[in-house]
Design a protein with these regions (language model features):
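Short, helix-capping/interhelical loops that line the mouth of catalytic, cofactor-
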Residues: 1-9, 56-120
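An N-terminal domain-cap segment
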Residues: 2-48, 57
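C-terminal interaction segments
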Residues: 229-283
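Acidic/His-leaning functional-site neighborhoods
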Residues: 211-236, 240
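A glycine-rich beta-turn/hairpin centered on an aromatic-Pro dipeptide
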Residues: 175-219
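Acidic interhelical loop/turn segments
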Residues: 24-36, 112-142
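Structural signal for well-ordered, non-membrane alpha-helices
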Residues: 20, 24, 28, 54-58, ...
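Short, contiguous alpha-helical
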Residues: 32-77, 131-189
Length: 283
């Protein structure tokens, strides 16, 4: 049975509160803030980016004005496509030079707690402006914040030789509370960027453990989410949602989980999954 928006709302709020505590504790215990965490970012840079996410998402969620140092990036964020989000990230990280992990832990926790406080009277279905001017349910903005804390918490922990696990239930909330609403939002195709080449639809049935089955249909107009049974499927994917989220963010390779049976792919055109994953992107 698919969870109602109010159920997602309460569960995401609880998970976000727990995760920001865990993330802040991790940051306060960092031994080498200059260690490489992801791409060219150090642990300190990654934490500064998470602060940016907390600031921008709390601003969108509450309808308040951003802090002055984030004003330019906030205005830019309203106009970008997904391929231009990296420019927003770069501006934010440059505009806010704090790199002390303990200080960043406090700033991130303060912002997430403020977001939870200011949205306590909402039910999660309210539409708010987000990246690229998309209108998303409030639940999805908090869901994106949860995703960033979990994915980048894992980046930071791995740089220190530690673990920062993502629970199956948390990943389920991210898929159902953030990704699927993002893909079905008005003008989601525009936010997804230019697709110059026409393409045949890629139809994928996604079977995530603990989630209802959904069908993702990608073509030159974007990606939509459908109920199963409406059209022939090219490729079926079965996986744990936490593992699938890390695959989609290129945090783990597909070969190992596939050989271990943690990810199963089958169907009449399984090779088309690669094209779908190129199109199903989340900031």
């Amino acid at each position: 049975m698919r969870a109602t928006p109010s159920t997602h709302w309460l569960d995401i709020r609880t998970s976000l509160e727990d995760t920001v505590d865990r993330f802040s504790t991790l940051l306060r215990s960092v031994e080498n803030r200059d260690a490489r965490a992801v791409g060219t970012w150090s642990i300190a840079d990654t934490a500064a980016h998470v602060r940016e996410v907390a600031v921008l998402n709390s601003t969108w969620a509450s309808g308040a004005a951003p802090p002055p140092e984030f004003r330019v990036a906030f205005d830019l964020a309203a106009t970008v496509s997904i391929d231009e989000v990296s420019e927003v990230n770069a501006r934010c990280v440059a505009a806010a030079p704090e790199r002390d992990p303990c200080a960043l832990a406090a700033l991130i926790q303060e912002r997430v707690e403020l977001m939870l406080y200011l949205t306590a009277g909402a039910d999660g279905t309210e539409l708010v402006s987000w990246l690229g001017g998309l209108k998303l349910p409030l639940t999805s903005v908090l869901g994106h914040t949860l995703s960033e804390l979990l994915v980048h918490g894992r980046d930071i922990a791995r740089a220190e030789g530690r673990a920062f696990p993502i629970a199956q239930g948390q990943a389920k909330l991210i898929f159902e509370g953030f990704l699927f609403p993002l893909l079905t939002a008005a003008d989601a195709a525009g936010f997804g960027g230019e697709r110059t080449d026409a393409m045949r639809p890629v139809v994928c049935e996604l079977r995530l453990k603990g989630c209802d089955r959904v069908v993702l249909v990608a073509d030159s107009g974007g990606v939509v989410v459908e109920e199963p049974g409406g059209r022939p499927v090219d490729v079926h994917v079965a996986a744990d949602p936490a593992l699938m989220w890390l695959l989609m963010f290129n945090r783990i390779g597909a070969l190992g989980p596939t050989l271990r049976g943690q990810v199963k792919v089958w169907g009449r055109r399984p090779w088309r999954l690669r094209r779908l994953l190129q199109l199903v992107k989340a900031p």
